[in-house]
Amino acid sequence: MGSQFSVLNRKWLIERSIMIEKRKRRSNKLIKILMMGNENSAKSTFAKKVKSIYQSDKIENSDANSILPYIKLYLSNSFKDVIKFIQQHPQSPDTKPMVSTQLGIIAWDKLSSFNYIPFNFKPTKELAKYIYDICHDPLFKSYIYPIISSKREDAFYLIENCKRMSNDDYIPNDEDIIRCSKNNQSGVFDTKLEIGKSEFVFVDTGNQKCDRKKWVHQFEDVDIILFFLALDEFDLPPDEIKSQSQSVHDCYNKLNENILVFDEIVNNHFFSNTPVIVLFNKKEQLIEKLKTTTFSQHYPDYQSNSNNPNDIFSFISNQFKLRDHFPLNKRLFIHSFNSSDTNQIDFFQYVKKILEDTI
């Protein structure tokens, strides 16, 4: 009897100390936000954008100098992906056309005969013009976009600005630094911001994928979870090999994979009362894909013939709602946003309101 009382007493003391710490942190106006999502969800872009808006200090020249070689590398890789695709699909009168504009046809002819050494490749101004022209051809864009955007979320930002970035005197501006992030980070990174009388700490788990159950408890003290989702990944293959309890064949694509990750993480008992905001990104890209791709062909659970974007948004939203194991706690909030639109990132008052309603 005494030992049982001792165990219960220790448990009560632990829970009490946790509650005291949480109240202390909130009284000090410290709000800790856990950010989750894959490398193409615009999670890192969001954090950098928020930091650039709310921090009084401008991005330093040292940041521009340090990221310059990476941007050149990313630009070169995007160029090579476009050229490789063109040269792997030679055109003839018998083949299906892949370009529809005069500038696109000229660029295709130039790039199809372009010779380069992969390990000594430099994006020149002349090459940038042809890459820009062909990637702005509507028909060609429908072919190339899924390929290059699956590799980098900033791929089309690079293409859009390739003429400027190919200049010999190019120096990255603030937007370049924000948008052209270093992908495939696997550590945990904090971004701290003081806004008004409150301090916000964004905790980014990077792209850690292994043994989530072993490390997720380290973030049990977060006040809110931001879960980022790229809507246009419904036709891309999943990244991970599922556990024994989850057959690989049960995961259809990267969109479905991220919904399963959501299920695994936010339904952990550590987060049963933690508000969760799901942020849908790349809505415009999804709409563009749906013009040429049928959603139900890549997502068998979607039992509808409609390829209407609004119907598909509703379906994806419901997938998250159905996977919330604690619906009575009213902790789930779903929104769409554009990571490059600064007007949509002013959400701190909204976060505060959610926290006030849930404390």
Swiss-Prot record:
GO cellular component: cytoplasm; heterotrimeric G-protein complex
Entries under SMART domains matching the protein: G_alpha
GO molecular function terms attached to this record: G protein-coupled receptor binding; G-protein beta/gamma-subunit complex binding; GTP binding; GTPase activity; metal ion binding
Keyword line: GTP-binding, Lipoprotein, Magnesium, Metal-binding, Myristate, Nucleotide-binding, Transducer
Occurrences of domain G-alpha (ranges): 29-359
Organism: Dictyostelium discoideum
Name under which the protein is recorded: Guanine nucleotide-binding protein-like alpha-11 subunit
PANTHER family to which the protein is assigned, alphabetical: GTP-BINDING PROTEIN ALPHA SUBUNIT, GUANINE NUCLEOTIDE-BINDING PROTEIN-LIKE ALPHA-11 SUBUNIT
Chain positions covered by the region annotation G5 motif: 337-342
GO process terms (BP): adenylate cyclase-modulating G protein-coupled receptor signaling pathway
Region (G1 motif): 32-45
Region (G3 motif) location: 200-209
Region of interest: G2 motif: 176-185
Binding site for GTP: 178-185, 204-208, 281-284
Binding site for Mg(2+): S44
Family label: Belongs to the G-alpha family.
Region G4 motif, residue ranges: 277-284
Lipid attachment locations (N-myristoyl glycine): G2
InterPro entries the record matches: Gprotein_alpha_su, GproteinA_insert, P-loop_NTPase
